[in-house]
């Protein structure tokens, strides 16, 4: 159907094409793809226009099955001429996927260039005919149109995720761009501020230099007025006067959009610097840089060529430098200090303090003032370093070293000098000296004078001494009315006990000792803790070796003795025999015409215990024992141990003053604050007066038995004293170890004094009869060189006191049918004491015999091998002298001992170095054969000498 219009245009409708609506924002074009074997395919290409939206908006979803509108005649899209109508219709009716937002790149509205794929025909525009029909090329019969497959849901999701990630990245990039712009703005502001500060400082520097130049000019004018000179010379000097140094042009700023102007180039409008004369003197107060200093022998040409300095009379060009980064106020003190930066022209200026010191020094030099010498009192210890001495004298260590160099001693500030040298140096420098010693820290601690008006009577301190098993602890148990023995393992005293009893309203302090070893240690440390010694002697056993030792210890300590004759209840008791035996050791009892009190007692039946206590009080009254309870406490350590629950526990005896909880005391090389005071009954007390034994808790370490203690003012003093004593103990230990090696003379003297070697033993058995048998057998093993010494023997198990006694005597412990308790085993393992157990007496005797044999020096046996006569002596290079010998008797072995005999006199004894026969090293040479011999480290051999060969063997000796 067709109609005609007035302008003769025909309106027509194509019956083969469906009327569709045009999708907005979509342009179509068809591309034909060629494949192998002549196959082709038409592909419809849609170009979508991107719709910009905000990030928070959701994409609009178009209808999937919307019909595609027909392309109008005026549309700019392109389609191939051979595209069939059916294909276009099918493509238009196909469902379209929902549009998704494209990336931020804007797509072109229509392709402006042809497709460049190979074998693809050039696209041509579609021309409309007057009748409205589109001109189409005839389609080949074997070609058919195909429609592209739609995207699956997973592909759509992947594409959507990619686009969302791209949007997120876009937002992040936009934020980063904003931050970068902000940072750049701040950096520009900072640089502008730095530039302003640099310009201000440069202006101040120029003003200062200008003022200095003006002042110098005025000074020169004044000097010229005072010293008249010829006019021509004055004019010449005025012409040659250099411009102020450092009057450089101002540093150019950083222009925007242009290249920065060099710092050394003068700006426009600024005054040019005056010419600088090369030979002009540098400005006072600011020396020339090193680059402008002329070296010896350097000419003007070298200056012009190398350093760029101006020739004489010619203005020097200012040096062009690279723009320098100016640091801000915060960065001024940061940066690396190098030689280049330090030697630049604009060097580091002096500080205000340095300028002030320089001005004061200049004024003093002008006025010729001398600084007064301040005399100080210098405290000089036993040793001091030069640096510390200089600090105490307020002198420079360099001056002290110079003085020592003049005296011929090359020393360093860290060298240590003695007190005499330090005193000479201090007096030479005009100071007074106060000599002190390290031991001065202990001054004022002990032996402080007591207040006689405050002296009161104190209880006596009594020590019970005597032989083992004579009843010392049983006697003390009977006096205390407490069963102490039953609480001890095996009935043997394990520790030193200190107790206090009351008799007739008066207190008596008793100290029980397990043997003489502990009392010896206390006496050796100077502990005069005992006022009265009770010598316990068994009436049935009389005087024994340890009884004699106890008598000697008491006499050495200057302690009065009271003899207690114990066990008088036994049938075999003979007290008179005891008194007679004591006469041999200069102990004269009253019944024998002496002054020593004696009391017959029985600890088991508690007989005459009151008489013994009365004798003690009588002796104490004769001694008139007094003490000052109001002064600081002093005393002695009776025993000390490390308790698992309470820490370091020390049993002490207060001798002077009163001890309170909270006091700070020093005991030997240990110190601490008293946390608690416990008496002998286990009760906590508030104070401990003179002659009162207490346990102290709170020490930092465990002191030694016999150490003296004293209360000090503060912890610093206590720590100083403890450190000094620890250092002194270390020095003594080192000296003891170095002296133990000693010289041969000391070793011979020690052998001469000690005499025979002793093998100390502590023997414990099940019954007394076994112990006596073992003791008798060991006594028979002794010789003139070695013998067994029984330190202690007794019936019962091995206790901790036995281990302590063995440790003090360096003895071994032997147990016969007995065992050690756990405390004794732990103590022995800790102290390294060996404990051996035996059940057969013969095994015990054999082991002791073998151990004692080890103390015997081995026997040296010498076996004669043979003689050789030297026939001729050869001097061989790199070997020395070699003796050509003939063996005349026996044989000669390599490595054997030899003696060189000349005129029947032995002149050398040594070993053979080589033994050869016909240039071959041999082990031995028999009699009648010739050989060559060389000695070790000896060459004085002559023809006719006789060489005697022998073998030495060391044979161990047995008892």
Swiss-Prot record:
GO cellular component terms, A-Z: cytosol
Region annotated G1, chain positions: 466-473
Location of the region described as Disordered in the Swiss-Prot/TrEMBL record: 1-374
Alphabetic keyword roster: Cytoplasm, GTP-binding, Initiation factor, Nucleotide-binding, Protein biosynthesis
Subcellular location: Cytoplasm
Pfam families listed in its UniProt record: EF-G_D2, GTP_EFTU, GTP_EFTU_D2, IF-2, IF2_assoc, IF2_N
Region (G3): 512-515
Region (G2): 491-495
SUPFAM superfamilies: Initiation factor IF2/eIF5b, domain 3, P-loop containing nucleoside triphosphate hydrolases, Translation proteins
HAMAP family: IF_2_B
Function (record text): One of the essential components for the initiation of protein synthesis. Protects formylmethionyl-tRNA from spontaneous hydrolysis and promotes its binding to the 30S ribosomal subunits. Also involved in the hydrolysis of GTP during the formation of the 70S ribosomal complex.
Name assigned to this protein: Translation initiation factor IF-2
Source organism per UniProt: Brucella melitensis biotype 1 (strain ATCC 23456 / CCUG 17765 / NCTC 10094 / 16M)
């Amino acid at each position: 159907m067709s109609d005609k219009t007035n302008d003769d245009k025909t309106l027509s409708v194509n019956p083969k094409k469906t009327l569709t609506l045009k999708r907005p924002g979509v342009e179509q074009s068809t591309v034909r793809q060629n494949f192998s074997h002549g196959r082709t395919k038409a592909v419809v290409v849609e170009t979508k226009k991107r719709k910009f939206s905000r990030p928070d908006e959701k994409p609009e979803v178009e209808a999937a099955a919307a019909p595609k509108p027909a392309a109008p005649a005026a549309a700019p899209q392109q389609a191939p001429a051979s595209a069939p109508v059916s294909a276009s219709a099918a493509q238009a009716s196909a469902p379209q996927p929902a549009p998704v937002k494209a990336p931020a790149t804007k797509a072109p509205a229509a392709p402006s260039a042809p497709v460049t794929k190979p074998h693809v025909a050039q696209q041509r525009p579609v021309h409309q005919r007057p009748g409205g029909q589109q001109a189409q090329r005839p389609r080949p019969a074997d070609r058919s149109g195909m429609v592209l497959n739609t995207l699956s849901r997973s592909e759509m999701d992947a594409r959507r995720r990619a686009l969302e990630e791209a949007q997120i990245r876009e937002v992040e990039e936009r934020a980063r761009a904003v931050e970068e712009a902000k940072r750049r703005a701040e950096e520009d502001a900072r640089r502008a501020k730095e530039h302003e500060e640099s310009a201000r400082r440069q202006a101040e520097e120029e003003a200062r230099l200008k003022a200095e130049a003006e002042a110098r000019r005025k000074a020169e004018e004044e000097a010229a007025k005072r010293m008249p000179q010829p006019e021509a010379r004055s004019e010449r000097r005025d012409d040659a006067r250099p411009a102020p140094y450092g009057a450089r042009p101002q540093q150019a700023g950083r222009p925007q959009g242009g290249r920065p102007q060099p710092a050394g180039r003068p700006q426009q409008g600024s005054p040019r610097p005056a010419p600088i004369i090369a030979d002009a003197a540098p400005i006072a107060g600011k020396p020339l840089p090193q680059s402008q200093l002329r070296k010896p022998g350097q000419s003007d040409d070298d200056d012009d060529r190398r350093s760029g300095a101006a020739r004489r009379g010619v203005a020097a060009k200012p040096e062009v430098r690279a723009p320098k980064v100016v640091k801000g106020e915060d960065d001024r003190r940061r940066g690396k200090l190098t030689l280049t930066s330090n030697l630049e022209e604009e060097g580091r200026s002096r500080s205000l303090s340095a300028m002030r010191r320089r001005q004061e020094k200049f004024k003093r030099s002008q006025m010729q003032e001398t600084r007064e010498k301040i005399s100080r009192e210098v405290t000089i210890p036993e040793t001091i370093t030069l640096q510390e001495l200089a600090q105490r004298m307020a002198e420079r260590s360099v001056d002290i070293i110079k003085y020592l160099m003049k005296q011929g001693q090359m020393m360093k500030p860290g060298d240590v000098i003695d007190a005499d040298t330090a005193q000479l140096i201090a007096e030479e420098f005009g100071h007074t000296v106060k000599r002190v010693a390290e031991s001065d820290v202990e001054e004022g601690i002990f032996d402080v004078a007591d207040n006689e008006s405050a002296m009161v009577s104190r209880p006596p301190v009594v020590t019970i001494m005597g032989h083992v098993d004579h009843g010392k602890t049983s006697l003390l148990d009977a006096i205390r009315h407490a069963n102490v023995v039953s609480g001890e393992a095996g009935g043997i005293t394990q520790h030193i006990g200190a107790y206090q009893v009351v008799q007739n309203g008066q207190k008596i302090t008793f100290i029980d000792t397990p043997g003489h070893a502990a009392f010896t240690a206390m006496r050796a440390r100077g502990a005069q803790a005992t006022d009265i010694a009770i010598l316990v002697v068994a009436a049935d056993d009389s005087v024994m070796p340890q009884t004699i030792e106890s008598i000697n210890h008491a006499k050495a300590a200057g302690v009065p003795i009271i003899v207690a004759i114990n066990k008088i209840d036994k049938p075999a008791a003979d007290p008179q025999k005891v008194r007679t035996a004591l006469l041999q050791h200069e102990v004269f009892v009253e019944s024998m015409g002496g002054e020593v009190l004696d009391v017959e007692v029985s600890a088991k039946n508690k007989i005459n215990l009151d008489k013994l206590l009365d004798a003690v009080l009588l002796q104490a009254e004769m001694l008139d024992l007094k003490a000052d309870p109001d002064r600081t406490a002093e005393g002695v350590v009776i025993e000390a141990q490390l308790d698992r629950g309470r820490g370091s526990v020390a049993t002490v005896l207060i001798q002077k003053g009163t001890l309170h909880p909270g006091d700070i005391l020093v005991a030997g090389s240990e110190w601490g604050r008293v946390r608690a005071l416990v008496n002998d009954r286990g009760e906590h007390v508030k104070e401990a007066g003179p002659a009162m034994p207490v346990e102290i808790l709170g020490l930092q370490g465990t002191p030694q038995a016999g150490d003296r203690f004293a209360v000090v003012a503060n912890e610093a003093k206590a720590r100083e004293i403890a450190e000094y004593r620890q250092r002194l103990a270390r020095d003594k230990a080192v000296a003891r170890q170095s002296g133990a090696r000693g010289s041969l003379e000391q070793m011979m003297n020690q052998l001469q004094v000690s005499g025979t070697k002793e093998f100390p033993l502590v023997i414990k058995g099940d019954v007394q009869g076994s112990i006596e048998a073992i003791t008798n057998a060991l006594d028979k093993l002794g010789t003139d060189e070695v013998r067994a010494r029984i330190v202690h023997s007794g019936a019962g198990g091995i206790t901790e006191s036995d281990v302590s006694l063995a440790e003090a005597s360096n003895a071994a412990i032997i147990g016969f049918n007995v065992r050690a308790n756990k405390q004794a085993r732990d103590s022995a393992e800790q102290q390294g004491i060996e404990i051996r157990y035996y059940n057969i007496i013969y095994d015990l005797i054999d082991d002791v015999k073998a151990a004692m044999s080890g103390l015997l020096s081995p026997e040296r046996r010498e076996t004669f091998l043979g003689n050789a006569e030297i026939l001729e002596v050869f001097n061989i290079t790199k070997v020395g002298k070699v003796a050509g010998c003939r063996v005349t008797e026996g044989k000669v072995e390599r490595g054997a001992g030899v003696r060189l005999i000349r005129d029947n006199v032995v002149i050398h004894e040594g070993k053979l170095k080589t033994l050869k026969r016909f240039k071959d090293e041999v082990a031995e040479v028999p009699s009648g054969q010739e050989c060559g011999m060389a000695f070790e480290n000896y060459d004085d051999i002559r023809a006719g000498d006789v060489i005697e060969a022998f073998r030495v063997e060391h044979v161990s000796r047995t008892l």
